[in-house]
């Protein structure tokens, strides 16, 4: 979904809530959304930056970022026959006009627009993004995909994806953020909200393959109803800096999440992923398995948490993160955590980090495999369980190429 640079750009430091409101009204947005944007901007302007211990924003000059006031352009391609079943897959801007009641009901119902300064910035300035609605008991067989790119000259992007699967529905949604390398700093602040109805199933793939120079500060939230299931697949390979706060709330009894991700930080990349699962319903399950590779002076942080409320009796949860270091200068921090307020649960976490074992390399070298080839095989095999779950062959192959280029 390429950006359209015909829109006038405004430096973030010079922007006012009046300009934001005027641009929103000029785009035909309803007054309730205009008021939300104004409130979010005031919060952004008045609040201090969040204190993130492991995300260093000192080199990022957000005040110098130029932002477009209005949609940059979003194109959606899909099988129109799905509309006969009541499925809606369109731009979020179009959905505001055609399905305003649904958008108003769900927009901001998972992600708090005033959660912190960058959440508020997104809520004030979001443009582009898709709206996916699957009605009750409808199964969408083929994956639906949205690709967000940066055109030449773009300095920022704020897409918002809103995914709704009603009771008994099933769908696969794939989002990808990708671009060429940039000389200037680029701000990407996307957000994705997912609502999984009772007995519904969502497979969600999020691939971050930005080029150099991109600062990716994103939010992702999913809310699950009774017996709802989400398979969440994350891929974090690009950009200069990444800070993703991702959360799944298992509200319904018997709900389930299976969450895997692959992260590879090399060069001077700093990539942080902060997944959190909150168990509210009874007899819910969460299984998280994250894999990380760091090389050169790359830095990766896994800040994972499983919270089990007092109401979350019968929970079964497992949280794991495993990291491989390919250089002595690379670094990874793994911070898995459990917060348990229920007394009838099964929960555990595990974390490993280190260089490839010499015994493993020696075994491969003794069979005539060159050292570089052996390392390549180990890393690709390490990521394979994650990449194999990507449902689109094209994305799966491109991800494999990107991983190979980093080794």
Model-identified regions with their sequence ranges:
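Conserved beta-strand/loop scaffold segments within soluble protein domains that form the structured core
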Residues: 88, 95-369, 383-407
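N-terminal amphipathic, basic helical "cap/leader" segment at the start of enzyme domains
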Residues: 2-123, 135, 289
């Amino acid at each position: 979904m390429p950006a359209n640079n015909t829109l006038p750009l405004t430096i973030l430091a010079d922007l006012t809530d009046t300009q934001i409101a005027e641009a929103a009204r000029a785009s035909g947005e309803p007054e309730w959304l205009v008021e939300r944007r104004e409130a979010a901007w005031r919060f952004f302007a008045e609040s201090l930056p969040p204190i993130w211990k492991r995300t260093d924003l000192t080199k990022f000059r957000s005040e110098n970022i130029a932002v477009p006031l209005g949609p940059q352009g979003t194109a959606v391609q899909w099988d129109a026959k799905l509309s006969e079943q009541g499925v809606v897959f369109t731009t979020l801007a179009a959905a505001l006009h055609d399905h305003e009641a649904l958008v108003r009901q769900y927009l901001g119902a998972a992600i708090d627009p005033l959660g912190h300064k960058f959440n508020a910035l997104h809520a004030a300035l979001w443009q582009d993004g898709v709206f996916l609605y699957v009605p009750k008991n409808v199964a969408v067989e083929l994956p639906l995909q949205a690709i967000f790119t940066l055109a030449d000259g773009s300095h920022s992007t704020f897409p918002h994806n809103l995914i709704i699967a009603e009771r008994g529905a099933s769908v696969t949604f794939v989002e990808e953020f990708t671009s060429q390398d940039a000389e200037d700093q680029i701000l990407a602040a996307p957000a994705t909200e997912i609502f999984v109805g009772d007995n519904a199933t969502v497979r969600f793939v999020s691939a971050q393959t930005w080029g150099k120079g991109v600062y990716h500060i994103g939010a992702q939230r999913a809310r699950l109803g009774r017996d709802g299931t989400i398979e969440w697949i994350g891929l974090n390979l690009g950009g200069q800096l990444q800070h993703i706060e991702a959360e799944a709330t298992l509200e319904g009894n018997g709900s389930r999440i299976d969450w895997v991700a692959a992260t590879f930080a090399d060069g001077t990349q700093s990539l942080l992923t902060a997944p959190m699962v909150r168990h509210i319903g009874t007899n819910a399950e969460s299984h998280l398995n994250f894999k990380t590779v760091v090389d050169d002076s790359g830095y990766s942080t896994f800040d994972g948490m499983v919270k089990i409320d007092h109401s979350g009796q019968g929970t079964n949860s497992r949280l794991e993160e495993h990291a491989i270091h390919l250089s002595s200068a690379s670094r990874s921090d793994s911070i898995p955590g459990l917060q348990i307020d229920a007394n009838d649960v099964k929960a555990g976490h595990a974390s490993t980090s280190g260089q490839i074992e010499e015994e493993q390399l020696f075994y491969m070298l003794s069979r005539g495999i060159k050292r570089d080839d052996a390392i390549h095989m180990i890393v690709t095999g390490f990521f394979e369980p994650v990449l194999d779950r990507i449902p689109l062959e094209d994305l799966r192959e491109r991800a494999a190429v990107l991983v190979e280029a980093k080794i």
